[in-house]
């Protein structure tokens, strides 16, 4: 993990409520913590002029969707993102999907779910219940985009909307 990512993650609040979508009122308490951590992460990114996603959930906090983007060669590549909260959350990290990239890279599972098994999942499991959605974005999706978008562009697999 690079120093910038480490410093950013250290500023994201750690969560304390160990609850998943089936845990009733405890889940509501967990969602409050999730939103507080996400708001802080967005503030950190905006302050660093590194705004790269927006996200929202359904009323129950079980289905999340939004947009993420990556700037490469002065062009903005924007993608839809989505994930469902696993029933076993927070023990199991959410599987973030970028459906439009499904099948375009080997670092992705069926349905456009990004591959996070080698580096991210062990880190997540060591930090249950303290890591949440903001941490999954910072430590999972952000590095994945940084590695994969340039590769996909340079190999002609994806094109910028202006180049189509």
UniProtKB/Swiss-Prot annotation:
UniProt keyword annotation of Lyase present: no
A Pfam family reported for this protein in Swiss-Prot or TrEMBL: UFC1
Keyword Nucleus found: no
Family in the record: Belongs to the ubiquitin-conjugating enzyme family. UFC1 subfamily.
InterPro entries: UBQ-conjugating_enzyme/RWD, Ufc1
Lineage: superkingdom: Eukaryota
Active site, per annotation: 115 (glycyl thioester intermediate)
GO BP, sorted A to Z: protein ufmylation; response to endoplasmic reticulum stress; reticulophagy
Organism of origin: Dictyostelium discoideum (Social amoeba)
A single GO molecular function term of this UniProt record: UFM1 conjugating enzyme activity
UniProt protein name: Ubiquitin-fold modifier-conjugating enzyme 1
Its job: E2-like enzyme which forms an intermediate with ufm1 via a thioester linkage.
Cited SUPFAM superfamilies: UBC-like
Name of the gene encoding the protein in the UniProt record: ufc1
Alphabetical keyword list: Ubl conjugation pathway
